[in-house]
């Protein structure tokens, strides 16, 4: 019903696209039963890759654009954290930033740092470049709190990854 109303607005030229966010597969299939969904935004990053199981294949099959949120895993995939970094904000409740999982994630990020260093790049730029190379990702919107971060993120466009490098990065975060 809601998607039908959005379709009417799209047909009238009042909106350009119909998008959904945080939908389960069941919800997405229901919303897209008439093929009207244009874009879905869902959590996806190198540390949380569940979208690869069903969501990304479904989106590709139905020509639905996919936009990941938390592409840098709340900063964890930027390389700025160490095991001694104080995590005092909302991240302290995120399992990615807790205990053994945090240390394991940091070890993976250090492997990324090796690849980034070889490419004379920062870890965050390498990760963003990896997204841009994925055929199932249509746009990446990394969060930025400072204007300088936006300018820094643009540097990802200058990193060219080979298929082998993308596979190497994916392999570091194998589920």
Region locations from a protein language model:
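Beta/alpha (TIM)-barrel catalytic core signal, keyed to glycine-rich beta->alpha loops juxtaposed to Asp/Glu
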Residues: 1-175
């Amino acid at each position: 019903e809601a998607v039908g109303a959005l379709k009417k607005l799209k047909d009238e030229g009042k909106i350009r696209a119909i998008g959904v966010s945080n939908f389960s597969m069941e919800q997405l299939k229901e919303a897209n039963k008439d093929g009207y969904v244009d874009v879905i935004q869902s959590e996806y990053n190198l540390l949380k890759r569940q979208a690869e199981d069903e969501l990304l294949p479904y989106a590709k099959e139905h020509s639905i654009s996919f936009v990941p949120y938390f592409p840098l895993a709340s900063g964890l995939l930027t390389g700025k954290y160490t095991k001694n970094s104080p995590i005092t904000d909302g991240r302290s409740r995120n399992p990615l930033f807790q205990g053994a999982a945090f240390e394991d994630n940091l070890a993976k990020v250090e492997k990324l740092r090796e690849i980034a260093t070889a490419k004379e790049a920062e870890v965050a730029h390498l990760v963003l470049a990896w997204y841009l190379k994925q055929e199932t990702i249509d746009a990446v919107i990394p969060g930025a709190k400072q204007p300088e971060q936006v300018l820094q993120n643009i540097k990802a466009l200058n990193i060219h990854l080979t298929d082998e490098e993308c596979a190497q990065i994916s392999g570091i975060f194998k589920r």
